[in-house]
Amino acid sequence: MGRAPVELTDRPEAPRDRTLCPAAGPVGLARASGSDGGHGISATKVFTLDPSTAGNNPEGVAWDSRSQTFFVGTVGTGTIYRASLRDTTLRPFITPPAADPADSAVGMKVSRGKLYVAGGTTGSIYVYDIRTGALMARFETGSGGFLNDLVVTEEGDVYVTDSFRPMLWHLTRAMIKAGTGTPQAINVGPEIAYTTGQFNLNGIVARRDGRELIVVSTFSESLFRIDIDRHNSAARKITKIDAPALAGDGLLIDRGQLLVVTGDPAEVTVLNLSRHDSRARVSKVLTDSSMHGSSTIAHAENRYLVVNADFTHSALPFTVSALPRGRSESHH
């Protein structure tokens, strides 16, 4: 786990330099002096999906600190790959049967021995046993949507973004424990505008014990704060965050900063958040020659795992770039 969130004032931070993480040699992380905070990690490591097949692009990633393994989902067959940080190759761990329409494993998170997966166009949310790979539960939201990313709060609730329908989907802790139930729909309009045929809400993270969510709309290049009342979804409050325009995909909160992944250009923009998350200012931008068409990110020990979905070119083999996390910076 990273450091506790650093609370900032509402004063905007000045933009900082773009940072290149070379695949070999010293890393130019801001103020890192070519090392990862004393952990000895100074170069990007690249993991390869084996097999890598055309049309089965990787998209989601999740890290399990207990087993020291990470998982990568794909959107062609729904196959979920697995590897440890010591490996160089990701291999299939969960392969949906041919009769199962789980052809998309998009956003994913690990919590309490379970792997939660957003099912894209299937409209399903899957819960797997992280030890055996067995399907423990499946929750349906109906057709017409694209379940893109999800977050599990400290209370055990799950919130899922829908890129095509203007709503969040909420699984309560009780539903997950029972393994059944109908996901609750939380309307995000009119505050968050949806454009038909485009990817709207995408990445999502939780703050303040799950009472606050931060989401990104890819098409409108906007970040939003959603204050949640888990007992009354109609009471939610949505506020647009004053932030640079970013066509973000995956999001990550680390050391109190918000990391936003974009595919074109393939970068990770690190944002400093104000005290009440009303503003976000660029701290630095991470990139690497191994990154292309990047989709999302996870924090794994002293690395950031960045998935190279590469939907534009789909060059084989598909890869995951493990960037050095770098030492934390002081915020003023």
Regions found by a protein language model. Name each.
Residues 37-55:
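A short helix->beta-strand "capping" segment at the edge of beta-propeller domains
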Residues 52-68, 97-116, 141-159, 190-212, ...:
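Beta-rich, blade/repeat-based domains predominating
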Residues 64-65, 70-77, 116-122, 158-164, ...:
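Conserved beta-strand positions in repeat-built beta-propeller and related beta-rich domains
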Residues 72-92:
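Beta-propeller domains
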Residues 78-81, 123-125, 166-169, 221-223, ...:
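Structural signal for beta-propeller blades
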Residues 84-88, 129-134, 172-176, 227-232, ...:
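Short loop/turn segments that connect beta-strands within beta-propeller blades
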Residues 127-183:
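Hydrophobic alpha-helical segments and helix pairs
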Residues 296-332:
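Blade-level signature of beta-propeller repeat domains, shared across WD40, Kelch, NHL, RCC1
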